[in-house]
């Protein structure tokens, strides 16, 4: 943990977190672990600990527990506390831990304080709940959260949250806001935001299956990305990253054509499959993650069969086995 403690200079702590995150982004993909549940839907702390340890063994650049892939929206405060604390314990400082927070600013602050106490290094602020908001309101939301926590913040634009370049410029001036995760894939808008921000402001590709657009994001100055595939097949995720950064266009194209693009097509069949398919694939690999919680649904038998075939194909491509 590198976040500033009581009495310390928060600016120093933020700089250390930014440095470690930048190093992690340069070294590997960003990992968003699933949250483990028992079959009855209760939180499975032991399964989650084992699963997080497996993710860490696969070498991510940073760990983002209790975020969208981790079903933050379905966790109560005690479950959230356990999820973040276990992630912090398992990483033991090896990589930064960025916990999710969100909803309205008051709820976001409650989760932020829990994450602080649990030892997180930073927070990913997910889109607020339900209502649309003007740009001034989006910036004010981040300002209020930043004023109420010592932890550095990464804004997440997705759904109803989409910052203009001017709003991103304003965010860069908010003490404590260190970066932006983009889930819109509007590359014109993102390019303008990158140009509006100082060099030390972090950006990363947070599309649902980020590898499909990784080359396009890199072209506008955002080479770092989160990988949902790392949550169930780090062999594939790591092989893709190595090929991408090594200029191995043939391998990149083959993985995209035979695995990633078909995965996106399967994902798009049913709302919520961006999480449900990931969790089902992890179960196919023997990971102790359990089912999703409502309102998400587990894949249908036909879609699970298609996922099994696709996962086998992807693993074969990188010399691994189901």
Curated annotation (Swiss-Prot):
It comes from the Bacteria. One of its GO terms (biological process) is D-glucarate catabolic process. Its EC number is 4.2.1.41. It catalyses: 5-dehydro-4-deoxy-D-glucarate + H(+) = 2,5-dioxopentanoate + CO2 + H2O. Keywords: Lyase. Pathway: Carbohydrate acid metabolism; D-glucarate degradation; 2,5-dioxopentanoate from D-glucarate: step 2/2. InterPro entries: Aldolase_TIM, DapA-like, Dehydro-deoxyglucarate_dehyd. Disulfide bonds: none annotated. SUPFAM superfamilies: Aldolase. GO terms for molecular function: 4-hydroxy-tetrahydrodipicolinate synthase activity; 5-dehydro-4-deoxyglucarate dehydratase activity. HAMAP family: KDGDH. Belongs to the DapA family. This is Probable 5-dehydro-4-deoxyglucarate dehydratase 2. The lineage of its organism: Bacteria, Bacillati, Actinomycetota, Actinomycetes, Kitasatosporales.
């Amino acid at each position: 943990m590198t976040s500033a403690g009581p009495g310390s200079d928060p600016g120093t702590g933020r700089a250390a977190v930014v440095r470690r995150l930048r190093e992690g982004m340069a070294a590997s993909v960003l990992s968003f672990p699933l949250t483990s549940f028992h079959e009855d839907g209760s939180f499975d702390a032991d399964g989650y600990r084992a699963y997080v340890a497996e993710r860490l063994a696969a070498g991510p650049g940073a760990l983002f527990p209790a975020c969208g892939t981790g079903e933050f929206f379905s966790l109560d405060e005690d479950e959230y506390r356990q999820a973040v604390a276990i992630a912090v314990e398992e990483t033991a400082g090896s990589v930064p831990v960025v916990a999710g927070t969100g909803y309205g600013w008051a709820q976001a602050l409650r989760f932020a304080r829990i994450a602080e106490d649990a030892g997180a290094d930073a927070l990913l602020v997910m889109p607020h709940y339900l209502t649309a908001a003007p740009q001034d309101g989006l910036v004010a939301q981040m300002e209020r959260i930043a004023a109420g926590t010592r932890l550095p913040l990464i804004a997440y634009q997705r759904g109803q949250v989409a910052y203009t370049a001017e709003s991103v410029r304003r965010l860069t001036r908010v003490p404590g806001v260190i970066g932006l995760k983009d889930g819109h894939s509007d590359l014109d808008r993102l390019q303008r935001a990158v140009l509006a921000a100082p060099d030390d402001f972090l950006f990363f590709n947070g599309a649902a299956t980020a590898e499909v657009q990784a080359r396009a994001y890199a072209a506008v100055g955002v080479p770092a990305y989160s990988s949902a595939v790392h949550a169930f097949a780090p062999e594939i995720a790591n092989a893709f990253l190595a090929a991408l950064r090594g200029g191995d266009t043939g391998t990149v194209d083959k993985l995209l054509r035979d695995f990633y693009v078909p995965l996106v097509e399967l994902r798009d069949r049913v709302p919520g499959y961006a999480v449900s398919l990931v969790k089902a694939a992890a179960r196919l690999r023997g990971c102790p993650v359990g089912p999703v919680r409502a309102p998400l649904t587990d894949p249908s038998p036909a879609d699970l069969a298609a996922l099994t075939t696709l996962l086998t194909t992807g693993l074969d491509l990188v010399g691994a086995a189901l």
